[in-house]
């Protein structure tokens, strides 16, 4: 009797390999999302306790950008796995931003430079929404995220005790885990994820500055 495709051991093995290949990126997305939630919980907890003082410009923009992109993604029926991670990437900063208003000890005074960086980030977000080229849109999204990061980087560098380290450790690991899940390696697919990995890596250096023996402040 001739075996069909489902009875062919070689075909079964190929199907199994294809299934494993297809689910591996999903596993990375799940782990990455859980890391973000864990780090976000620790930061939110410390914010409510007054131990951590979020820079509201950074955290507002970190919440805004993913949620804006999520709205656009839903309008074109984007992949649900990627959308879940984007949703968490917007909700976690949003919750932290709101949490900073519940304890006066969590307040961090904003400077004109913070507002300037926020303005640049918002401008990049605006042009990102208007961009017709996917490549330009991704680069603008990366620029918006970088401009939003600068105020918190300076604060963390000068006053690392006002930050919760775990969120940056987890965010860095989360960004690294997503790299192998990139389906096609080109600038459009990888630029934003690489910028996230580099940004969180820089933040790790900032929050561990004193532990690394770096005394110079900005």
Kindly give the residue locations of the regions a language model identified.
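N-terminal amphipathic/basic-hydrophobic helices that include classical n-h-c signal peptides
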Residues: 1-20
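Alpha-helical membrane-protein topology signature
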Residues: 16-218
């Amino acid at each position: 009797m001739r075996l069909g495709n489902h009875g062919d051991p070689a075909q079964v093995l190929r199907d199994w390999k294809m299934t494993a290949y297809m689910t591996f990126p999903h596993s990375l997305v799940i782990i990455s999302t859980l890391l973000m939630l864990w780090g976000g919980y620790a930061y939110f907890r410390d914010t409510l306790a007054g131990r951590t003082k979020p820079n509201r410009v950074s955290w507002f923009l970190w919440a805004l950008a993913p949620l804006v992109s999520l709205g656009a993604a839903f309008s074109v029926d984007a992949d649900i796995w990627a959308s879940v991670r984007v949703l968490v990437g917007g909700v976690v900063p949003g919750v932290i931003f709101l949490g900073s208003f519940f304890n006066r000890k969590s307040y961090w005074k904003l400077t004109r430079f913070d507002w300037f960086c926020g303005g640049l980030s918002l401008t990049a977000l605006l042009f990102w929404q208007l961009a017709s080229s996917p490549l330009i849109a991704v680069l603008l999204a990366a620029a918006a995220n970088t401009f939003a990061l600068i105020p918190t980087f300076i604060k963390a560098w000068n006053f690392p005790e006002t930050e919760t380290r775990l969120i940056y450790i987890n965010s860095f690991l989360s960004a690294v885990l997503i790299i192998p899940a990139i389906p096609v390696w080109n600038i459009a697919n990888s630029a934003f994820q690489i910028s996230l990995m580099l940004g969180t890596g820089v933040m790790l250096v900032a929050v561990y500055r004193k532990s690394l023996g770096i005394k110079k402040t900005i």
